[in-house]
């Protein structure tokens, strides 16, 4: 039997919403350090479509790597082939964010939020300081171009602690 302890790091408001689902195997935290303190050793750290929405994706990646989880899986994350981080504005409909229908009383409307495309070479170099990249996969080809350069190819990295 394998017991899984799932510690989710999210925004404060998402943590508050998640408290209703909290039990022995699922907990919500608003910081990496508080999740790690509660959990102790971490076998697998998963980040899915999150780094690009952090105010400083590289600093957040460094914080994730410092956890020293046995394995890290970075998935659904767009990277830039250039040498500098490209920051843009992403738009979506409110209903496209989160599972299920909009709560009663909410109006579906366009929302705007910042998104960062960090240089893939910089990310790989940071990872390789502490981890071995076991595989890297192109999950979704670029569909956004600036001056004929792809800026958002989505990659996945599965990494093992050295």
Language-model features, listed with the residues they occupy:
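Class I SAM-dependent methyltransferase SAM/SAH-binding core
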Residues: 1-34
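A short acidic, Gly/Pro-enriched loop at the edge of an enzyme's catalytic core
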Residues: 33-45
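A short SAM/SAH-binding and catalytic strip from SAM-dependent methyltransferases
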Residues: 43-57
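A short, conserved alpha-helix within the catalytic core of class I
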Residues: 53-69, 74
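Conserved beta-strand signature within the Rossmann-like core of class I S-adenosyl-L-methionine
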Residues: 68-94
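Acidic, Ser/Thr-rich peripheral helices and adjacent loops at domain boundaries
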Residues: 87-116
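Short alpha-helix
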Residues: 109-139, 152-156
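C-terminal lobe and adjacent flexible extensions of AdoMet/dcAdoMet transferase-like proteins
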Residues: 157-162
């Amino acid at each position: 039997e394998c017991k899984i302890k799932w510690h989710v790091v999210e925004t404060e408001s998402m943590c508050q919403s998640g408290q209703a689902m909290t039990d022995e195997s699922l907990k919500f935290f608003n910081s990496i350090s508080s999740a790690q303190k509660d959990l102790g050793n971490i076998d697998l750290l998963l980040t899915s479509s999150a780094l690009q929405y952090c105010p400083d994706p590289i600093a957040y990646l460094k914080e994730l790597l410092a956890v020293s989880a046995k394995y890290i899986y970075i998935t659904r994350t767009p990277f830039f082939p250039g040498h500098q981080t490209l920051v843009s504005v992403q738009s979506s409909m409110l209903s496209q964010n989160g599972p299920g229908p909009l709560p009663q009383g909410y109006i579906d409307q366009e929302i705007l939020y910042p998104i960062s495309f960090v240089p893939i070479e910089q990310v790989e170099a940071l990872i390789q300081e502490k981890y071995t990249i076991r595989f890297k996969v192109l999950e979704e080809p670029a569909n956004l171009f600036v001056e004929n350069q792809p800026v958002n190819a989505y990659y996945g990295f599965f990494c093992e602690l050295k």
